[in-house]
Amino acid sequence: MTAIAAVIYGPDEDCDVLLTDFAHDLARAGVAVAGLVQVNAGASCAEIDMELELVGSGRRFNICQDLGSGSVNACRLDPAGLAAAAGALRAALEQPASLAIVNKFGRAEAEGGGLVAEIGAAVEQGLPLIVGVPKRFTEAWAAFAGGLDDRLPCSRAALDAWWARQVPAAAE
């Protein structure tokens, strides 16, 4: 059975930095990681620019659309950018990997879109999988994961401990 870690985080916790640092550290240590991590950069898209980085390649995909000053509370997710990132992740999942990481199970995934197919592909391949899950989407995540996940707090110690339990399985 595939091991799935759901990193549950609130609005005051930076899961993006946690997953990015974790993925980069593993990749530097020689672990084959197929994943997308979110890198929040400067101000070209309202307050922050949202980019997904394909782990290992450094390739980035802008997933933020500037909707103008009158859309402060609107969803700024760019479906075309997300689709391009999803395609790159799907291609990465076709290569040998020891771990898959998906930056977020958010609104798009809760509605059945976004990176749902790529999450499914990682599970189908039997890869250990880490997914960031905002607290506001835990109910949708629970319905999606069907109890097959380990819920983790948003901490490096929790991720390190979970990964240490997966290493023998990942090496097989």
Give, region by region, the residue ranges found by the protein language model.
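Glycine-rich P-loop/Walker A and Walker A-like loops and their local beta1-loop-alpha1 context
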Residues: 1-33
